[in-house]
Amino acid sequence: MTVRVAINGFGRIGRNVVRALYESGRRAEITVVAINELADAAGMAHLLKYDTSHGRFAWEVRQERDQLFVGDDAIRVLHERSLQSLPWRELGVDVVLDCTGVYGSREHGEAHIAAGAKKVLFSHPGSNDLDTTVVYGVNQDQLRAEHRIVSNASCTTNCIIPVIKLLDDAYGIESGTVTTIHSAMHDQQVIDAYHPDLRRTRAASQSIIPVDTKLAAGITRFFPQFNDRFEAIAVRVPTINVTAIDLSVTVKKPVKANEVNLLLQKAAQGAFHGIVDYTELPLVSVDFNHDPHSAIVDGTQTRVSGAHLIKTLVWCDNEWGFANRMLDTTLAMATVAFR
């Protein structure tokens, strides 16, 4: 069957989900029937077609009245502020992809359900009372038909959780720290301007800016045994896409750097193929732009100190990789629900 999807919020992730759907050739599996976005339809069409990070969209895009066309596919455009007023029942929506970055509570999910959607997938970490949180490649097999309101976690969680799992399974992690080196985001300023976070009052293109992160909480959500044993910090850097994560863990078993790399390389070629990639090429962040993997391990940066402290660098395209995981999780939800 083809999963009928509606997208709520047509920003960076919402637009990349549509592009990833068409570029990955999954239109027989997923069809987008509607997009709800407060911006005007002409602007939606323009930004879908022309993207500073990902270049021109190869498909023809046009807008006619209340419809957006990608090739010959018509997508209804809505501008509803109230979730309860969305016509999901009328449109026969199977899964709503809520890509607003604003909504994430069970109450918001239930509003989509009340409007007629069968399932809801948030494109960001949700509240603890959601049915489950998925990091595709790690725990999607735990999805059940009764899971209606689901979170796809965050781009950084999707990046680091598979690597942590691999290291923990092999060597037994005792504790760890994570530093996220993240490209600038829409909640920063082009030039100095007011913001509740005084660091984010400063021009994004001119500084490396420390910001708060809940990544440590995201890690312990998947690995409760690491509660109070993982910490995370984050900085934003003056690039517009791609993120690097510096992961340091202490492990129980003694290990060498080449053994760590061999473990991660084998995983990329085997059980985590398509989710984790591995490289030893002398690459920089722009080289990972438009990479569909959740995580790309940079084997040239792996270090081991004292046989028990592992440091490694993991890259991800925080937009494109995550958009592809949204599609993967959507299909996984539909498979268990509608089989």
Swiss-Prot record:
Swiss-Prot/TrEMBL site (Activates thiol group during catalysis) positions: H182
Gene Ontology biological process terms from the UniProt entry: pyridoxal phosphate biosynthetic process; pyridoxine biosynthetic process
Record's keyword annotation contains Phosphoprotein: no
Classification via InterPro entries: E4P_DH_bac (IPR006422), GlycerAld/Erythrose_P_DH (IPR020831), GlycerAld_3-P_DH_AS (IPR020830), GlycerAld_3-P_DH_cat (IPR020829), GlycerAld_3-P_DH_NAD(P)-bd (IPR020828), NAD(P)-bd_dom_sf (IPR036291)
Binding site for substrate: S154, C155, T156, R200, T213, K214, R236
Catalysed transformations (reactions): D-erythrose 4-phosphate + NAD(+) + H2O = 4-phospho-D-erythronate + NADH + 2 H(+)
Keyword field: Cytoplasm, NAD, Oxidoreductase, Pyridoxine biosynthesis
Pathway: Cofactor biosynthesis; pyridoxine 5'-phosphate biosynthesis; pyridoxine 5'-phosphate from D-erythrose 4-phosphate: step 1/5
Main location: cytoplasm
Recorded GO MF terms: erythrose-4-phosphate dehydrogenase activity; NAD binding
GO cellular component terms given for this protein: cytoplasm
Active site as annotated: C155 (nucleophile)
Catalytic activity, EC: 1.2.1.72
Compartments, record wording: Cytoplasm
Pfam families: Gp_dh_C, Gp_dh_N
Protein origin, superkingdom: Bacteria
Residues annotated to bind NAD(+): R12, I13, R81, N318
Quaternary organization: Homotetramer.
Function description: Catalyzes the NAD-dependent conversion of D-erythrose 4-phosphate to 4-phosphoerythronate.
HAMAP family in alphabetical order: E4P_dehydrog (MF_01640)
Family: Belongs to the glyceraldehyde-3-phosphate dehydrogenase family. Epd subfamily.
Entry protein name: D-erythrose-4-phosphate dehydrogenase
Lineage, highest ranks first: Bacteria, Pseudomonadati, Pseudomonadota, Gammaproteobacteria, Enterobacterales
Gene coding for it: epd
